[in-house]
Amino acid sequence: MFGLGGQELILILMIILLLFGAKKLPELAKGLGKGMKEFKKAQNEMEDEFNKAMDDETPKKKDFGPDRE
């Protein structure tokens, strides 16, 4: 995860705690969770649209009957 170790994550969490205070942390976590959920949803929608567009552009193989030699 971004090349961060345990000590770096603890340091970042302590800085966030000092900046925003203990009372704001649940609100920040909730907002972060919602943001991540919306981002993941948008990412999935874009992937679905891309895959659909690629499927639509792929030429369909037509069946002309039995093979003749």
Swiss-Prot record:
| Spans annotated as Disordered | 49-69
List cystine links.
none
Q: How does it sit in the membrane?
A: Single-pass membrane protein
> Keywords in UniProt for this one?
Cell inner membrane, Cell membrane, Membrane, Protein transport, Translocation, Transmembrane, Transmembrane helix, Transport
Q: Where in the cell is it found?
A: Cell inner membrane
Q: Which GO terms describe its molecular function?
A: protein transmembrane transporter activity
Q: Which residues cross the membrane?
A: 1-21
InterPro entries named among the record's database cross-references: TatA/B/E, TatA/E
Recorded superkingdom: Bacteria
What the entry lists under Pfam families is as follows: TatA_B_E (PF02416)
In the record, biological process GO terms are:
protein transport by the Tat complex
GO cellular component terms given for this protein: TAT protein transport complex
Which portions of this protein are annotated as coiled-coil regions?
none
Q: Which family does it belong to?
A: Belongs to the TatA/E family.
Q: Which PANTHER family match?
A: SEC-INDEPENDENT PROTEIN TRANSLOCASE PROTEIN TATA (PTHR42982:SF1)
The protein's role, per its UniProt record? Part of the twin-arginine translocation (Tat) system that transports large folded proteins containing a characteristic twin-arginine motif in their signal peptide across membranes. TatA could form the protein-conducting channel of the Tat system.
Describe the protein's quaternary organization and the partners it interacts with.
Forms a complex with TatC.
Q: What is this protein called?
A: Sec-independent protein translocase protein TatA
Organism the protein comes from? Chlorobium luteolum (strain DSM 273 / BCRC 81028 / 2530)
Phylogenetic placement of the source organism: Bacteria, Pseudomonadati, Chlorobiota, Chlorobiia, Chlorobiales
